[in-house]
Amino acid sequence: KEDIINMMVGRVIYEDPKEHSMVAPDAPVVLKVEHLNAGKMVQDVSFELRKGEILGFSGLMGAGRTETARALFGADPKQSGKISIMDKSGQLREVTINSPQDAVKYGIGYLSEDRRRYGVVVQKSVNENTTLATMEEFTNGIFINKAKEKEVSERYVKELATKTPSGDQLVVNLSGGNQQKVVIAKWLTRDSDIL
């Protein structure tokens, strides 16, 4: 069976499932998706995410991984299904997500597999990209508080060990891994509950 799968995909697939979760079985459910349908690739998808849990979608290209994440984030339209998110009181409640703005409002951040296209603005600095999802917190009218922006950006550069000469460095000049750290910093700055 393994040889056939490896020949089909053209590489070795390692399946080493975890024997037990590090998340307590009674950890609260923070996201529940039921019977999500979005386009041809996302058909009747249901899952739960518990607080502290890392949930990954795997599969070959075209299996619907990216499309599921984009529908959950509101970047692609969903035809049907129910999305429930834990609110501030700790209760799951059904929400309507029709756009990325809705998803962000409900505490969801999106880490795209194509970070250069959907995660960062490569011709902007590390500082500017770090605050993209929270720009309203760094502006006073039409002016950006650059000192506050720099302070927050420097904190995440340090916490995530981002290799950059300064926060003024353009993201296009960073390695792919460091660009990904800038995307993560953007959502951490937003204080997203779900990435």
Where do the model's predicted regions map?
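Glycine-rich phosphate-binding loops of nucleotide-dependent enzymes
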Residues: K1-L195
